[in-house]
């Protein structure tokens, strides 16, 4: 009986080692499980991006409005007979109106 018990304990120890520390053990399972979660997140982002691209393709295939909007926004195109007005931000407008000291001094010396 003693030899059988010893053999079973050795077998149990080997199985526990394989389960916890061996190839395809608990550590590998946890690592792969985390990798799967990360990959599912990436897949969800890519799926959303693909849906947006398919919607954009459908808009472009659907008619002239989407093509016209894209030409206006991305290429700055206008229709014949339209006027284009560029709005300058307030900070740039103030900087353009205030004369610098070098311009003032050069104007005074020329008179």
Swiss-Prot record:
Span list, region Disordered: 88-111
Extent of Low complexity compositional bias: 97-111
Keyword Transmembrane helix: yes
UniProt-listed Pfam families: DivIC
Subcellular localization: Cell inner membrane
One GO CC term on file: plasma membrane
Protein role: Essential cell division protein. May link together the upstream cell division proteins, which are predominantly cytoplasmic, with the downstream cell division proteins, which are predominantly periplasmic.
PANTHER family reported in the protein's UniProt record: CELL DIVISION PROTEIN FTSB (PTHR37485:SF1)
Protein name (Swiss-Prot/TrEMBL): Cell division protein FtsB
Native species: Pectobacterium atrosepticum (strain SCRI 1043 / ATCC BAA-672)
């Amino acid at each position: 009986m003693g030899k059988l018990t010893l053999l079973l304990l050795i077998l149990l120890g080997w199985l526990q080692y394989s389960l916890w520390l061996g190839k395809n053990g608990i550590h590998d399972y946890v690592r792969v499980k985390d990798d799967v979660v990360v990959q599912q997140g990436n897949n969800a982002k890519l799926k959303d991006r693909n849906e947006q691209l398919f919607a954009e393709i459908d808009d472009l295939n659907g008619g002239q409005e989407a093509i016209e909007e894209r030409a206006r926004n991305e290429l700055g195109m206008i229709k014949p007979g339209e006027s284009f007005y560029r709005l300058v931000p307030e900070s740039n407008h103030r900087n353009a109106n205030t004369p610098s000291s070098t311009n003032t001094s050069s104007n005074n010396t020329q008179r």
